[in-house]
Every structure is written in C-alpha cells, then in structure tokens.
C-alpha cells in the first residue's frame, strides 16, 4: 500500500535551530569523561554542556499537530487539560516525544490507544534512561508507540526522582509491556506500580543494585588468555 496522497501523515523535517529550546542539566569535562590518564592531545581540558532538547513551540509540523490536537480534545472529554497531563512536546530530528506527568500516564496511554483519530494500538516496550544530573527527574521511562491504522509513530516520556522511583504500570493498557517493565525495573530500579509480578527478569533475585544506572560501580573479573591476562574493567582507566 502506497503512502502517496497522504502528505499530512508525513513526519516533519528537522526543526530549525532558531526554533529549538534546550535545557542544560550539567557539564561534561574531558574527552568522553576519561579520568586518570596522561592526556597529551589537549582534549582533556574540553568542557561541554550536557543538553536535553526542550519543549518545541507550535506548529510541530506534519501529523504531530493532529496527534496533539486529538490528544488534547480526548483528554478534555475526560476532564483533564492538555497542559495538566502533558508537560512538554519535543520535536527533535523528525520525531516527537510527549512528556507526560507520571500520574496521568495510564489515562494518556488509554486515550492514545482507544481514540479513533489516534489509534496507537501498539506499544513497542519501555526503555529506561538515567540522567544523574537531571535533579529531581533522574529516572526516565520512554515508550515508543505505533499507530498501525494511521501509520504514525510517537513517544511518551515520563520522569521520576531517585528518591521516589515510582511510575504507573501500563500493563493494563498494553499487556505486552509485561517483561519490558520487569527488565527496566531490573536494570534501572524504576518501580512500575500496578504491575502483576514486578520481579527481576535477567539478574539474580539477590543481585545488589541496578546495573544500567550511571552511578552503578564498574566491576569485573580478570580474563585469562594464553600468555596474557586482561584486567577487569574497574582496574582500567575510567570512562563515563
């Protein structure tokens, strides 16, 4: 089936640099964060801000405005304002991400799934992200959604603090998120409230900590080869 004749469903081109807003959450020093090595390249003194793309002003372009309008209208019918449930809309590199306040995540997901003009029938899982510099919002959960009916893709992003790492589970809306939420809990420590069986899925039950967090200590064991031995990662130069 051809998509010709459906220009309104095409994703927009890259937003101009003038229209982008960024949020600085930290500063990175040195090349790739290397520490404790003899640097002769000069890059060891590199100082670079850590930036997150901020909210994008209207118009978003392509079908992104249609999705935002449809979501806003459906939320209003539920008695919730768009700005109350959605804290940001970011268009970056031809993709759109709706930042959702965590208490409204199940409602937003259900509306996106059930509203005929939206019909995002498929959630492709959940990805955890850890931003230690993003104070009060260190843990992020990202949900890629696909509308098979309308041939559209969007993302939902929810943030939670380290001190209260709870996000509502989407198991009731998208049951296939079952194992994805368990994996994100396993590796990042995000607690998905309402999940029917939130247990570790890859690491042993008694494993300390959550290994994909950026503050997780690097460790390992030496690996022996014929005539040589490779030191464990925590005994090598540090990169972060």
From Swiss-Prot:
Taxonomy, top ranks, is: Bacteria, Bacillati, Actinomycetota, Actinomycetes, Mycobacteriales
Instruction: Name the predominant localization.
Output: membrane
Class in the EC hierarchy, top level: translocase
Q: Which reaction does it catalyse?
A: a quinone + NADH + 5 H(+)(in) = a quinol + NAD(+) + 4 H(+)(out)
- The protein's name is NADH-quinone oxidoreductase subunit C
For this chain, one GO molecular function annotation is: NADH dehydrogenase (ubiquinone) activity
> Family per UniProt?
Belongs to the complex I 30 kDa subunit family.
Q: Which HAMAP family match?
A: NDH1_NuoC
The cellular location(s) given in this protein's UniProt record come to: Cell membrane
Species assigned in the record: Rhodococcus jostii (strain RHA1)
């Amino acid at each position: 089936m051809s998509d010709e004749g459906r220009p309104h469903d095409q994703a927009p081109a890259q937003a101009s640099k003038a229209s982008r807003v960024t949020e600085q959450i930290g500063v990175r020093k040195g090349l790739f964060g290397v520490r404790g090595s003899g640097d002769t390249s000069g890059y060891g003194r590199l100082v670079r801000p850590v930036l997150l793309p901020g909210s994008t002003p209207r118009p978003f372009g392509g079908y992104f405005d249609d999705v935002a309008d449809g979501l806003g209208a459906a939320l209003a019918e539920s008695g919730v304002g768009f700005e109350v449930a959605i804290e940001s809309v970011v268009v970056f590199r031809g993709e759109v991400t709706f930042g959702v306040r965590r208490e409204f995540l199940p409602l937003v997901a259900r509306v996106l799934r059930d509203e005929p003009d939206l019909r995002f029938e498929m959630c492709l899982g959940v990805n955890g992200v850890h931003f230690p510099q993003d104070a009060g919002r260190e843990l992020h959960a990202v949900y890629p959604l696909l509308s098979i009916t309308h041939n559209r893709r969007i993302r939902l992003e929810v943030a939670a603090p380290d001190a209260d790492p709870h996000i509502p589970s989407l198991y009731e809306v998208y049951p296939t998120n079952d194992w994805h939420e368990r994996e994100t809990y396993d590796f990042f420590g995000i607690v998905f409230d309402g999940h029917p069986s939130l247990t570790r899925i890859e690491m042993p039950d008694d494993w300390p900590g959550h290994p994909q967090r950026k503050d997780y200590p690097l460790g390992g064991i030496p690996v022996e080869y014929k005539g040589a031995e490779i030191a464990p990662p925590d005994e090598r130069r540090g990169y972060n």
